[in-house]
């Protein structure tokens, strides 16, 4: 099925010509009255405008959030859980619309937004609705007459900065636990993908009290920095590149507030020789695991961008893998048959293409792809890159630096020790993959990898109840899982004596 392009008669959603900020339950134009063009990566054409906000708009959003914080923070867990479930219901009722909008805004295939992005977002809201209902305080009996009570209280007003690779899903990862915990939010979407989060906000606006959720669009230095450096937020959560994460951490340290940072990665995907002991469905699954580098156009922090293959397996495995890469269907993201769509921006496409040049200059061999994809017709102005496979060694820049595109760098290893050394030879530690039929090896090797998530005989699964986060320069803190509530709460201890007698110190 091919969905109609925006602005045409058969389009399932009509975008507004211009989108304002959502502050205090209403749509408000930016204080300075400026807007910027929003381009769809599918064709490279402008399809609407978004507010180009500044510190003045962030201030208005913070005013609204602080005005709502006390009342929202005092709602019961049952009330907040009910609202989160209603949000999930609203998203479910509008799943196709949100999937369409996300594909237009980001350029990813609509088959992924229909099957993964939006269903996962729905599930995350339901999951944290359940988590907050199940959360309990605790008490400790110190002695016969002294009790320590522990209460979970919201932080208050928090800031959230969302990336452009999964706008709705990454927003949900932050919104769901923050709302469940009783916080008010000022959220800034990425300037590359400002609209899908606003469409989501339109759909759920009536479900939340004014001021609880505020969405302010704009550029990083003009809107993101004033939010992250504000003395009026109790926490900042950020997903994006490591260099920006360092700046966010500096701002937070000046105000002594906690941060959650989900940053870059250069994830190893390790294939042991025993996977080829039979040519069966598991071997085919491992081949698919290799090709996961192209999912979401490689624009995933955990993209398996380094494939480490046992030397005795290499020839047979790479032949099968390249055959699978060759049949990846690239085309219009609005076609449900398309497997790989457009990169999110022309800047990102140019970065990816520059790394292809770097790989060649370093002496890497191009096994597949290696160039811009020319799709013709109305897609000619879009941002398309061929799925690319390089063969090289782990010291090359294409092995060490995050490309954030459909590019995988392949090398071989002799034994398990060398594989572990190669896997950990990186500044990053977000994701990784291990493929083996040996359960003991899978456990041993998985524990040895210095990464926050180790997919074992699978890849790119993101359930709500599995903790996600990085080691090393891939970030601080965790997202998802009920432990995420801890990142948006603080513990109040009431230490109470029920003894009428004096303590006897003075």
Swiss-Prot record:
Coiled coil regions, renumbered to chain: none
EC numbers, comma separated: 1.2.1.3
Keywords carried by this UniProt record: NAD, Oxidoreductase
Chain sites annotated for binding NAD(+): 218-224
Family matches, as Gene3D superfamilies: Aldehyde Dehydrogenase, Chain A, domain 1, Aldehyde Dehydrogenase, Chain A, domain 2
Keyword Cytoplasm: no
GO molecular-function terms, A-Z: aldehyde dehydrogenase (NAD+) activity
Keyword Zinc annotated: no
InterPro entries: Ald_DH/histidinol_DH (IPR016161), Ald_DH_C (IPR016163), Ald_DH_CS_CYS (IPR016160), Ald_DH_CS_GLU (IPR029510), Ald_DH_N (IPR016162), Aldehyde_DH_dom (IPR015590)
Source species, domain of life: Bacteria
Stated name of the protein: Aldehyde dehydrogenase
Lineage: Bacteria, Pseudomonadati, Pseudomonadota, Alphaproteobacteria, Rhodospirillales
């Amino acid at each position: 099925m091919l969905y109609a392009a925006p602005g045409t008669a058969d389009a399932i959603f009509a975008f507004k010509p211009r989108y304002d900020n959502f502050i205090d339950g209403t749509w408000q134009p930016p204080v300075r009255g400026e807007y910027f063009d929003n381009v769809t990566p599918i064709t490279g054409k402008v399809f609407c405008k978004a507010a180009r906000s500044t510190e003045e708009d962030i201030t208005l959003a913070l005013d609204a959030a602080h005005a709502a914080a006390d009342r929202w923070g005092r709602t019961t867990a049952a009330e907040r859980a009910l609202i989160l479930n209603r949000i999930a219901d609203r998203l479910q009722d509008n799943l196709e619309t949100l999937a369409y909008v996300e594909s237009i805004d980001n350029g990813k295939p609509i088959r992924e937004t229909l099957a993964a992005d939006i269903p996962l977002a729905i599930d995350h809201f339901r999951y944290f609705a359940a988590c907050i209902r199940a959360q309990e305080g605790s008490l400790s009996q110190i002695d016969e007459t002294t009790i320590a009570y522990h209460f979970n209280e919201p932080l208050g007003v928090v800031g959230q900065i969302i990336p452009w690779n999964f706008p709705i899903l990454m927003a949900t990862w932050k919104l769901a636990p923050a709302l469940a915990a009783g916080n008010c939010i000022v959220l800034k979407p990425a300037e590359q993908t400002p609209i899908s989060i606003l469409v989501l906000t339109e759909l759920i606006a009536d479900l939340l009290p004014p001021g609880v959720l505020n969405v302010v669009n704009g550029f990083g230095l003009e809107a993101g920095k004033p939010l992250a450096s504000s003395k009026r937020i109790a926490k900042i959560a950020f997903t994006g590149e490591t260099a920006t994460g360092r700046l966010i951490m500096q701002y937070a340290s000046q105000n002594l507030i906690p941060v959650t940072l989900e940053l870059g990665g250069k994830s190893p995907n390790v294939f042991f020789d025993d996977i080829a002991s039979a040519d069966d469905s598991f071997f085919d699954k491992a081949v698919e695991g290799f090709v996961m580098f192209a999912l979401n156009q490689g624009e995933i922090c955990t993209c398996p961008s380094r494939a480490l293959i046992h030397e005795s397996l290499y020839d047979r495995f790479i032949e099968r893998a390249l055959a699978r890469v060759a049949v990846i269907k690239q085309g219009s993201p609005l076609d449900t048959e398309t497997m790989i769509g457009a990169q999110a921006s022309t800047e990102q496409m140019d970065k990816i293409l520059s790394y292809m040049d770097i790989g060649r200059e370093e002496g890497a061999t191009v096994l597949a792809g290696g160039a811009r994809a020319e799709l013709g017709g109305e897609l000619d102005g879009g941002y398309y890159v061929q799925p690319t496979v390089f063969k090289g060694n782990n010291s090359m820049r294409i092995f060490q630096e995050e490309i954030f595109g459909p590019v995988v760098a392949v090398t071989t290893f002799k034994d398990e020790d060398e594989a572990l050394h190669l896997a950990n030879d990186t500044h990053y530690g977000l994701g990784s993959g291990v493929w083996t039929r040996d359960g003991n090896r899978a456990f041993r090797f998985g524990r040895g990898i210095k990464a926050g998530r180790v997919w074992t005989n699978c890849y790119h699964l993101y359930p709500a109840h599995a903790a996600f986060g990085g080691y090393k320069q891939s970030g601080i803190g965790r997202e998802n899982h009920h432990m995420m509530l801890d990142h948006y709460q603080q513990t109040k201890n009431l230490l109470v004596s029920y003894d009428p007698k004096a303590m006897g110190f003075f």
